[in-house]
Amino acid sequence: MKAMEGKIIQVLGPVVDVEFESYLPAIFEALDINFEVNGTQKALVLEVAAHLGGNRVRAIAMDMTEGLVRNQAVKARGKMIEVPVGEEVLGRIFNVVGESIDNLEPLKPSLTWPIHRKAPSFEQQSTKTEMFETGIKVIDLLAPYSKGGKVGLFGGAGVGKTVIIMELIHNVAYKHNGYSVFAGVGERTREGNDLYFEMKEGGVLDKVALCYGQMNEPPGARNRIAFTGLTMAEYFRDEKGLDVLMFIDNIFRYAQSGAEMSALLGRIPSAVGYQPTLAGEMGKLQERIASTKNGSITSVQAVYVPADDLTDPAPASVFAHLDATTVLNRKIAEKGIYPAVDPLDSTSRILSPQMIGEKHYEIATGIQQVLQKYKDLQDIIAILGLDELSEEDKKTVERARKIEKFLSQPFFVAEVFTGSPGKYVTLQETLEGFGGILEGKYDHIPENAFYMVGSIQEVLEKAKNMKNS
């Protein structure tokens, strides 16, 4: 196989040019370099990104290129980067090339799949829209997720993005008996570490595969890690027929790493310095996240919005693909209401009577109207006080405050911190509770009884206990 060997002719940071004698590796083919740095052996994987003419290729490094020199030997693999798939990946942490990085016994995979795969064809895709029950009241009621849909999770630091992600992983594991895949794209190493140990404590680790391409890694690793995670999720969908949850944190970093590579590959930048292929790259990733006749991949993607500018090309390219948005609000978190989901800002494509039914739609819009009216009355209350409101408005305010409190919920994964047992609330129970509040059935119950409980039954029990004590 001497023909498949080449040599380095140029190193430009994470981009390496390689020349072969008589062989030309295909685009996306993996190349291996084994070399020594300061007495330690290193194995580096490159991925072919462009043909430069002759038998020269330009490749992207999946790890640091320190220690590479010209004329060093490179070996073509004859195939793409392949990563382990199957149940053995659960509970483990992987890097972009599928090596386990959790200091446990190295995984000897029985099955590997290439990370670049075709999106499901039109014939394979499932067209029926089905709601995906999360067991989280505020999401199921006001911004429901669809099976195989894509959800954007917007929120600043410390408002509870990670906790919602962990709760979703927990609920999928225990209520739907499903698996989750978490791809940390350009994540802080500390956050990835915290997530691993929190999942271990929360008891959900054996139902999730973790793939990390951290902030300190070269752009190739940060970009391709999304495909590594997605490939693992696709196996569970296509071969096991499961409904999988795929988390990407953060999708903005995927676009950002593509921009870093694009300039080095010699492409002329487009708007705001992003790569000219931004929309195509985003589409390539997002189109693989789909429902097929076998199973589905529902994805929750954390979206960082640079300088809070929603028109920035990177977040704008994500919006086109989203079916629902879950917006976390710091003001709600400050009130002590968790999950801190903004009930008026969060949206869903399936929140329509045709998709979720007349009853659910009426209750959801009714709740939003009451909350919006309460928001509009805030200024009057601040200036004149509650007593100056009409009887009708007073009732609205009372109900809105109960709704706000009832949208909070104790989480299973937060039991360690809160001390109160987690609650999974079915859609039926959620609709029954909020429908009753709108009808005025619970006007006589104090608002504190609605705080941090599951179903409306618990509200009644809590109110009874409060009365007795």
Swiss-Prot record:
Question: What protein am I looking at?
Answer: ATP synthase subunit beta
PROSITE patterns linked: ATPASE_ALPHA_BETA (PS00152)
Reaction(s) catalysed by this chain, per the record, are: ATP + H2O + 4 H(+)(in) = ADP + phosphate + 5 H(+)(out)
**Taxonomic source organism:** Helicobacter pylori (strain J99 / ATCC 700824)
Localization, per the record, is: Cell inner membrane
Protein function: Produces ATP from ADP in the presence of a proton gradient across the membrane. The catalytic sites are hosted primarily by the beta subunits.
Which terms are listed as keywords in the entry?
ATP synthesis, ATP-binding, Cell inner membrane, Cell membrane, CF(1), Hydrogen ion transport, Ion transport, Membrane, Nucleotide-binding, Translocase, Transport
Q: How does it assemble?
A: F-type ATPases have 2 components, CF(1) - the catalytic core - and CF(0) - the membrane proton channel. CF(1) has five subunits: alpha(3), beta(3), gamma(1), delta(1), epsilon(1). CF(0) has three main subunits: a(1), b(2) and c(9-12). The alpha and beta chains form an alternating ring which encloses part of the gamma chain. CF(1) is attached to CF(0) by a central stalk formed by the gamma and epsilon chains, while a peripheral stalk is formed by the delta and b chains.
- Name the gene behind this protein: atpD
Has UniProt tagged this entry with the keyword Cell membrane? yes
Major location, coarse class?
Answer: membrane
The entry lists its GO molecular-function terms as:
ATP binding; ATP hydrolysis activity; proton-transporting ATP synthase activity, rotational mechanism
Record Gene3D superfamilies: 2.40.10.170, Bovine Mitochondrial F1-atpase, Atp Synthase Beta Chain, Chain D, domain 3, P-loop containing nucleotide triphosphate hydrolases
Tell me which EC number(s) this protein carries.
7.1.2.2
